Amino acid sequence: YTKFSYPKSISVKLTSKELKNENYIKILIPHLKTEIPLFVVFKALGCISDREICEYIIDNNKTELDNELLKLLRKSIEDASHICTQIDALTYMTTYLNSTNYYSYETDITTKIKYIKNIVIKDTFPHVGDKYINKCNYLGLTVNKLLKHHLGIYDLDDRDSYINKRVETCGILIGNLLFQSI
């Protein structure tokens, strides 16, 4: 028995207000109708302290670059300052469930939290595995690259390069053909 499904996509966005030098980092997760602040997602993954989250993102070389990265993260830290526990983060995320979803009509908060936990485990970086620490490491690496590109240290990835292409095996391609014909 083989299960075929569409690729899950997550986007990490860095937005800024032009007049102020404030940078917001937000993440768009499947089944949620709006972008969630970065530190809320980290807290939903089990990283509670802001220091621990910053250690996942920053290289910790004690260089000037670390200070620049911290300056870029300041507004994101402030966005999630009212979230103190993992349950608080999951409860915050339940308010943004898609209205087309069955669980958005549930009134029981524990059912919604279980559903959000399932989204965090299964739909957030599914290629990394089910362990929260692996997801935190990957999210930290992604945000690190985003911030370094914003500072001009990294260039954009070449989307046309074969290094950045997804290679689909013959089984997945046949499954996609069968799924399209249904």
What is each stretch, according to the model?
Residues 1-182:
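N-terminal non-catalytic structural scaffold regions of very large proteins
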